[in-house]
Amino acid sequence: MIFRHDGDNDFTDLFCGLGGSTRGLIEAGLRPRLVMNHDPIQVATHRLNHPDCEHLVEDINAFDKRSLPRTRILWGSPICTEISPAGGRKRTRGQIALLDQDGQPIEGDAQPEFQRTRATALDIIAATEVHRYDAVLCENVPEFFLDWELFDWWLGGFKILGYNHQIVCASSAHLGDGDNETAPQHRNRGYVVFTREGIPLPDLEVRPAAECPGCGPVRARQVWRNPRRRKMGSWGVQYDYRCPTDSCGLILEPTTRPIGDVIDWSAAGQRIGDGRPDRKKFTPYATSTRERVAAGLARFGHEPHVTMLRRNTTAVSVAGPVPAVSAQGKHHALIVPNGRKGAVRTTLEPLTTVACKPHHSLVRPAPEVDDCTLRMLSPRELASAQRFPADYILPAASQEAQILGVGNAVSVNAARWLGERVKAVLA
């Protein structure tokens, strides 16, 4: 598909990585002028996909912001590895409680400070002070908005520079409309859009398509369970979607894309009873992995399912609507987080968050665990879960570099959703 862009609406993409944000903004009709990242592998791959803009391999902390070009828009996603729930860390003092989709506190090993997060966030202010962009767009994990003690001070810095701001939180599975397909992945992220005084704030109301049993097809409204707290968190825990009809107001599940749509069902897996294929001599799968596969068999019979070897959530049933899942598609999957606890989901649902390490494995069931086949989802499948197009070039260096780039990327549909709305107020 060819996307037409307005030559006047150009943008700079700091921390561009593999290019999810760049691709999304291009789809929104914006033009990239310069992109930057510290990782030469990701920048080289970005250049292959987007050859018509300038590429820099630089550490933004040490880069003279005066050397950046003057563009109308700046996109910046501050480094979030210190605070991402995928890294697993204990919460810091002074925060608002954040729960996972099961309502359980996010816990893990403590990380001492927000050092890199703070530094890269301040780089965005520094660039804005020099170039006075018409709009600045930032994306990060909810913890950036909830846990960082300087977050309100950071917002205040933009206010001093003459900017208004608007914050929105949503899952990548719920952002999209028209030909902007949603991502088949539950990826909760916060976004903040700054516009210069005199430029209207964009309409960032999240209104995903849903089916109301009484009212039919609707655009659901995002409703926060505790409106007195900062509107940031996870769907089904901190907020819901309701029917917009005043006389109805039912809690609805947005229409989503199933992960089964992007799985290569022709790729063969390894029989579990034959042991792990990544070992030279026979090594059985861990007991916890076998137990998760058995749980999937018990819940979903003999349909294919995906095991997610990562974080803790609780079991999700395919029998009816439950928080953080949706039901559509032709296949089933078991998705179980890596760690102490696991959860089961189906390919009727979107994938959970794609991280920077391989966590998702496809299981083809059989009557016994040993006879099931298992394989990790490929980088291409994970890229599709981030809504990259099928022909998007991935790093050639290694599978690890591919997964790193995909896991760090902004979901393409989310960047496009924001870009379209910002473009509307800059017209």
Task: Cite the ranges covered by each PLM segment.
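Conserved active-site and SAM-binding loop architecture
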Residues: 1-427
